[in-house]
Amino acid sequence: MAKKSMIAREVKRKKLVKKYSAKRKALLDEFNAAKDPMERLEIHRKIQGLPRNSAPNRVRNRCWATGKPRGVYRDFGLCRNQLRQRAHNGELPGVVKSSW
C-alpha cells in the first residue's frame, strides 16, 4: 500500500491538470502559431508561470486499490498483483486464466 500522502499528492495533481488544461492549451496553441521569436519567448514565460503540477505529464498512473505506482494495467487501473488476485477470485468479468 502506498503512503496516503503520495496518493493525496496525485489527486492534487489531477485536480490541477483539470483546472489549468484550457488555459495551458490556449497558451500552447498561441505559442505554436507565433512566428516572432520575442513573442514566442513571452508566451513561453506565461506557460512557465503556470503551476508545475498542472502539466499532464507529471500525473502518474496508480492502482486504485493499493495506490502502487508501478506495474499498473491501464485497462483495469489495477497493479499486477491486484489484477492477478482479483482475476483468480473472479472479480474481473471476462478475464480467464490462459491455457493452451
Swiss-Prot record:
<keyword id="KW-0699">rRNA-binding</keyword>
<dbReference type="GO" id="GO:0005737">
    <property type="term" value="C:cytoplasm"/>
</dbReference>
<dbReference type="InterPro" id="IPR023036">
    <property type="entry name" value="Ribosomal_uS14_bac/plastid"/>
</dbReference>
<dbReference type="InterPro" id="IPR001209">
    <property type="entry name" value="Ribosomal_uS14"/>
</dbReference>
<comment type="subunit">
    <text>Part of the 30S ribosomal subunit. Contacts proteins S3 and S10.</text>
</comment>
<dbReference type="GO" id="GO:0003735">
    <property type="term" value="F:structural constituent of ribosome"/>
</dbReference>
<keyword id="KW-0694">RNA-binding</keyword>
<dbReference type="GO" id="GO:0015935">
    <property type="term" value="C:small ribosomal subunit"/>
</dbReference>
<protein>
    <recommendedName>
        <fullName>Small ribosomal subunit protein uS14</fullName>
    </recommendedName>
</protein>
<comment type="similarity">
    <text>Belongs to the universal ribosomal protein uS14 family.</text>
</comment>
<dbReference type="GO" id="GO:0006412">
    <property type="term" value="P:translation"/>
</dbReference>
<dbReference type="Pfam" id="PF00253">
    <property type="entry name" value="Ribosomal_S14"/>
</dbReference>
<dbReference type="InterPro" id="IPR018271">
    <property type="entry name" value="Ribosomal_uS14_CS"/>
</dbReference>
<keyword id="KW-0687">Ribonucleoprotein</keyword>
<dbReference type="GO" id="GO:0019843">
    <property type="term" value="F:rRNA binding"/>
</dbReference>
<keyword id="KW-0689">Ribosomal protein</keyword>
<comment type="function">
    <text>Binds 16S rRNA, required for the assembly of 30S particles and may also be responsible for determining the conformation of the 16S rRNA at the A site.</text>
</comment>
